[in-house]
């Protein structure tokens, strides 16, 4: 293939205008196709004819026709643009097969996923990964996510769910709130303030399953789990949390576990839409399960 002399190459806008004129059969139709004005298309085609010093179109009343030279050039452009589009589509497909978008509860992302994520990137540096922290049950397709991680019992409509890890719930508190105690009776827990996140209604049922009366407890409310957990670390109140998310807090003594719930149905699940799985998503799912 001979080297391209870019200085002799006609402007791309003029080539597009003529190719559209040839395929659509006129300036007006080409203008609609390219979302520009009739005058802009006509001007570009005239400029191309001047650049090539060859007539490409001719008029017969209201009808526009291609000259023999115009027909040959239009075919060459159609073939060339078709090859460019095919190559671009292949690149986009390759990129979309590798790209991965994951929706995940914010605290799970910060406390469980982020400490492990460097290992994934080290092993798979070619997979672009985007995290969408969101505590809501979002529609994966609507937000453009390949997979999601959800907390619950593993039953949600419209998705395939795969168990990732158990989520035993524990009651924790900062050491200063407990005054040196390691365990509290139900009566003692009922007398202390509680830190609560507003977007987790099931926590009231869990507290009730412990033998507490939620309506009689004093709550300090926070809009999300991140702030509620931060408040618990500061000693503002007792807090119900997934043990897997506070392993470091317990190990370092920032929080003390004072009660374990026996509820075993809760867990974190990987969810995805039905149908073919993105290859990058399969790699990430396999890695998640190995980490868990």
Curated annotation (Swiss-Prot):
The answer to whether keyword DNA repair applies is no
UniProt GO molecular function = DNA-binding transcription factor activity; sequence-specific DNA binding
Does the keyword DNA-binding belong to this entry? yes
Write down the Gene3D superfamilies for this protein, in alphabetical order: Periplasmic binding protein-like II, Winged helix-like DNA-binding domain superfamily/Winged helix DNA-binding domain
Q: Which Gene Ontology BP annotations are present? A: DNA-templated transcription
Q: Which residues bind DNA?
A: 27-46
Q: Which superkingdom? A: Bacteria
Name the InterPro entries on file.
Answer: LysR_subst-bd, Tscrpt_reg_HTH_LysR, WH-like_DNA-bd_sf, WH_DNA-bd_sf
Q: Which PROSITE patterns match?
A: HTH_LYSR
User: Which part of the chain is the HTH lysR-type domain?
Assistant: 10-67
| Keywords carried by this UniProt record | Activator, DNA-binding, Transcription, Transcription regulation
Pfam (any one): HTH_1
Record-stated family:
Belongs to the LysR transcriptional regulatory family.
Its function, per the record, reads: Functions as a low-light activator of ahcY expression (gene for S-adenosyl-L-homocysteine hydrolase) and as a high-light activator of an uncharacterized 21.6 kDa protein in the ahcY-hvrB intergenic region (orf5). It is also a negative regulator of its own expression.
Q: What is this protein called?
A: AhcY transcriptional activator HvrB
Organism in which the protein naturally occurs: Rhodobacter capsulatus (strain ATCC BAA-309 / NBRC 16581 / SB1003)
Q: Which gene encodes it?
A: hvrB
């Amino acid at each position: 293939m001979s080297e391209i002399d870019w200085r002799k190459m006609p402007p791309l806008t003029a080539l597009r205008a003529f190719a559209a004129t040839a395929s659509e059969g006129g300036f007006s139709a080409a203008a609609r196709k390219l979302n520009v004005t009739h005058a802009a298309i006509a001007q570009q085609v005239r400029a191309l004819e001047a650049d090539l010093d060859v007539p490409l179109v001719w008029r017969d009343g209201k009808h526009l026709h291609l000259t023999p030279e115009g027909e040959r050039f239009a075919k060459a452009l159609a073939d060339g643009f078709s090859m460019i589009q095919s190559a671009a589509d292949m690149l986009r497909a390759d990129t979309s097969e590798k790209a991965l978008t994951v929706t995940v509860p914010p605290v799970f992302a910060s406390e469980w996923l982020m400490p492990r994520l460097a290992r994934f990137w080290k092993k798979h540096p070619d997979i672009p990964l985007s995290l969408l922290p969101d505590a809501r049950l979002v529609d994966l397709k609507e937000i453009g996510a390949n997979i999601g991680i959800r907390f619950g019992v593993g039953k949600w409509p419209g998705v395939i769910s795969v168990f990732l890890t158990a989520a035993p719930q524990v009651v924790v508190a900062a050491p200063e709130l407990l005054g040196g105690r390691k365990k509290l009776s139900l009566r003692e827990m009922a007398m202390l303030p509680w830190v609560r996140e507003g977007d987790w209604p099931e926590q009231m049922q869990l507290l009730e399953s412990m033998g507490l009366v939620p309506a009689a407890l004093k709550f300090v409310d926070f809009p999300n789990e991140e702030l509620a957990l931060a408040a618990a670390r500061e000693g503002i109140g007792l807090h119900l949390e997934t043990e897997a998310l506070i392993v470091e807090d317990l190990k370092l003594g920032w929080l003390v576990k004072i009660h374990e719930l026996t509820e075993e149905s809760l867990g974190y699940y990987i969810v995805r839409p039905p149908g073919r799985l993105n290859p990058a998503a399969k790699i990430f799912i396999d890695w998640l399960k190995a980490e868990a």
